[in-house]
Amino acid sequence: MLEITLLGTGSPIPDPDRAGPSTLVRAGAQAFLVDCGRGVLQRAAAVGVGAAGLSAVLLTHLHGDVLITSWVTNFAADPAPLPIIGPPGTAEVVEATLKAFGHDIGYRIAHHADLTTPPPIEVHEYTAGPAWDRDGVTIRVAPTDHRPVTPTIGFRIESDGASVVLAGDTVPCDSLDQLAAGADALVHTVIRKDIVTQIPQQRVKDICDYHSSVQEAAATANRAGVGTLVMTHYVPAIGPGQEEQWRALAATEFSGRIEVGNDLHRVEVHPRR
């Protein structure tokens, strides 16, 4: 069984009720933080997960809204290196983040006798193929389409016969269909293009170019034959009592289980027999 927790269901648009985009996937004793938008460390703390409890951080792309909480560490005296898996460019972003916190790191090393080095991090960059295989949990990567943001990737996590695919920001594409084929669950970002296109600001309308609508995400789930569609990264934010509107739109393209939730919404994923 895999457990999905929507830590942050928001978008780059500030929302007092939604943290930035991030999803926690638990696979047995392992836990993976997929993207890490603003406020996600607080959301992770709410479900009892700290930096020391993470097996790895997985980044689908390098847009700022999924990187705001990229400073993930703990106060252990000798922590194991934290793996960060992302597309090419991830190492540069991590290096820049460590540099930005250089003064803070120096202050803490000077203050605490048991801290002698910056936090250990292992960066692994992928565009496709296997990315993880430990203790019965595997992760596979495939390219997605969020151009002009490139490269971008999605992740397929498998454990004990259950599988979940995390698409990140993307428009429909063959590589995502292939990655998600037969998965038990697909976590997909969604926007309401019918609403966004009515906003009289071109920069806002532009986001329709490289995100999937609710119906497009649902059609991807249908083509891939997944069991459950989990929607997240809602643009605009879902208001109270509006969840059924979004679910109904998805249901026009996908007849399986559809999950729409606020931050901290949990979904259990079991292998389909």
Curated annotation (Swiss-Prot):
Endpoints of the signal sequence: none
Entry binding sites for Zn(2+) 1: 61, 63, 146, 169
Keyword Nucleotide-binding: no
Record keywords: Endonuclease, Hydrolase, Metal-binding, Nuclease, tRNA processing, Zinc
Summary of the function given for this chain in its UniProt record: Zinc phosphodiesterase, which displays some tRNA 3'-processing endonuclease activity. Probably involved in tRNA maturation, by removing a 3'-trailer from precursor tRNA.
InterPro entries in the record: AtsA-like_MBL-fold, Metallo-B-lactamas, RibonucZ/Hydroxyglut_hydro, RNase_Z/BN
Record-given protein name: Ribonuclease Z
UniProt keyword DNA-binding present: no
Molecular function per GO: 3'-tRNA processing endoribonuclease activity; metal ion binding
Subunit structure as annotated in this protein's UniProt entry: Homodimer.
Listed EC numbers: 3.1.26.11
Free-text comment on the cofactor: Binds 2 Zn(2+) ions.
Lineage: Bacteria, Bacillati, Actinomycetota, Actinomycetes, Mycobacteriales
Catalytic activity: Endonucleolytic cleavage of RNA, removing extra 3' nucleotides from tRNA precursor, generating 3' termini of tRNAs. A 3'-hydroxy group is left at the tRNA terminus and a 5'-phosphoryl group is left at the trailer molecule
Gene coding for it: rnz
Superkingdom as given in the UniProt entry: Bacteria
